[in-house]
UniProtKB/Swiss-Prot annotation:
It is an enzyme of class 2 (transferase). It comes from Streptomyces hygroscopicus subsp. limoneus. It comes from the Bacteria. PANTHER family: GLYCOSYLTRANSFERASE, SLR2126 PROTEIN. GO terms for molecular function: metal ion binding; transferase activity. Involved in the biosynthesis of the antifungal agent validamycin A. Catalyzes the final attachment of glucose from UDP-alpha-D-glucose to validoxylamine A to yield validamycin A. This is Validoxylamine A glucosyltransferase. Instead of having the common DXD motif at the position 130-132, it contains a DTG sequence, which may provide greater metal ion binding flexibility. It catalyses: validoxylamine A + UDP-alpha-D-glucose = validamycin A + UDP + H(+). Its EC number is 2.4.1.338. Keywords: Antibiotic biosynthesis, Manganese, Metal-binding, Transferase.
Length: 453
């Protein structure tokens, strides 16, 4: 395992990747009758683990594409299956340009599996499909079209009918068992229960993701495509993300931060076939990965992603962002220097450097005569406030665009957290969440505006 630095980013933007040995299903994949040796236009990467029957269905839909089979390839990346997955892949060698890569089962490592598949891919475009996604017959054609033309798309989020793991519809199973994907869409394509659960978010911006502040929230790799060069430019999937959930959104965050635009394609659709899920385990795993997200990208938006996901209200991240913008506007100009001084006065004398975090630091978060041996971490949800913050000559001050709902620091990292009155607005909505987080990271917490000091 090694780290890849993301150019132009500080150390948190270091992506963990592995270099596993790949094992193509044959030393040489026999060409299909009539196939040419030209480089495929698209590589479809499918991670899988012990879902041979679902994989068979996904590959079956890719074998009936309107695009000539020699123009695209399929790479199945196996996360350590013990079922007949390898045999399923072999059964498609005469119908698809297909490759297979296997990695040892060391737990849920879908990020590593996708990277392994992407390394084996040879096309300039990568598409990621989840096992169990039933591609429409024009899926490949539509992906290629979306990335072509005078203004080709960079990242394309393909729609996925039937995807709502929280509330799977009882009719979905019989529908996809009885009909091919295109007939299923013809019959119930307009039914509310059949829609991609992201549809309300896309509709709200007329499917123009440039109008979204956080399009990366909807970068879900059950159906997505992008140039291979852009995928590797940002480091691919971060393999520190193990277990279910979040690794795709974190990649979307880095793509967006690099200025790579995202679009939605309703034409390159698939249907997610229903399958068993371990919902409680998935939620627990997702929260661990949300925590990793905050530690790797310590700023307000990943913090809000963690906070709303922790409350089970994932779709409201944008709502919370707007609320914090309003609270920042209301608190602009509010000075809390006296409150910070009161908090610092509670520190006992020490010969060692003491670490102090301030939630709601404001513009002037530095005492005129700062206490010696104190390292200040000034946190505020108003990024404009932090941009105006002056640093101290000795470098003992750092600024963080965080509210305090979830911070990147380990338990008991600080000697003291000071929560100021600039947090009054957020506290009305989030209650004791800030105090709870403060007690997690510090041995002492002071809230001068609440104590009456």
């Amino acid at each position: 395992m090694e780290g890849v630095d993301i150019p132009g980013r500080p150390s948190p933007w270091r992506v963990c990747v592995t270099r596993p040995q790949v094992h193509p299903i044959n030393a040489k994949v026999a060409p299909m009758p009539g196939a040419t040796s030209h480089v495929p236009l698209l590589s479809v990467v499918i991670p899988t683990y012990n879902r041979d029957a679902l994989l068979d269905r996904t590959l079956g839909t890719l074998a009936r594409q309107t695009t000539a089979p020699e123009d695209f390839e399929v790479v199945v990346s196996d996360d350590g299956s013990t079922d007949t997955t390898r045999d399923v892949v072999r059964s498609y060698e005469d119908r698809l340009r297909i490759k297979y890569v296997f990695q040892e089962d060391l737990g849920y490592r879908v990020a590593s599996a996708r990277n392994g598949g992407a390394r084996l891919a040879s096309a300039p475009l990568l598409a990621f499909l989840d096992t169990g996604v039933l591609a429409g017959p024009q899926y490949v054609q539509s992906v290629l079209a979306a990335h072509a033309g005078p203004a080709p798309a960079k990242v394309v989020l393909g729609c996925c009918y039937g995807y709502d793991p929280r509330n799977p519809h009882p009719e979905l199973h019989s529908l996809v068992e009885e009909f091919p994907p295109e007939e299923a869409v013809r019959r119930v394509g307009d039914a509310p229960w059949f829609q991609d659960m992201r549809l309300p978010e896309f509709t709200a911006v007329d499917f123009d993701l440039s109008r979204m502040h956080m399009p990366w929230l909807w970068f879900w790799t059950l159906n997505v495509s992008l140039p291979a060069a852009d995928f590797w430019r940002v480091g691919g999937f971060d393999e520190d993300f193990t277990g279910w959930g979040g690794e795709d959104i974190e990649l979307g965050y880095r793509l967006h931060a690099h200025g790579i635009p995202m679009t939605v394609s309703r034409e390159s659709w698939g249907i997610e076939a229903p399958h068993e899920r371990t919902h409680e385990a998935n939620v627990s795993s997702l929260m661990l990965n949300c925590d990793r997200f905050v530690r790797k990208h310590p700023s307000l938006l990943p913090e809000l992603f963690w906070a709303v996901t922790n409350r089970g209200i994932f779709g409201s991240v944008e709502t919370e962002r707007l609320r914090f913008e309003e609270w920042a506007s209301q608190a602009r100009g509010q000075q809390v220097l006296d409150e910070i001084a009161i908090g610092l006065d509670t520190l006992p004398p020490s010969q060692h450097t003491q670490r102090v975090a301030v939630f709601g630091s404001g513009t002037e978060g530095l005492p005129t005569a700062p206490r010696q041996n104190v390292e200040l971490f000034l946190c505020d949800y108003d990024e404009g406030v932090l941009a105006r913050q002056e640093s101290r000559d000795d470098g003992a001050v750092s600024t963080w665009h965080l509210s305090g709902l979830r911070t990147p620091w380990p338990d008991q990292h600080f000697d003291l957290v000071i929560i100021t009155s600039r947090m009054d607005g957020p506290r009305q909505a989030w209650g004791e969440a800030f105090t709870k987080e403060a007690h997690r990271i510090a041995s002492s917490v002071v809230e001068p505006s609440l104590s009456g000091d």
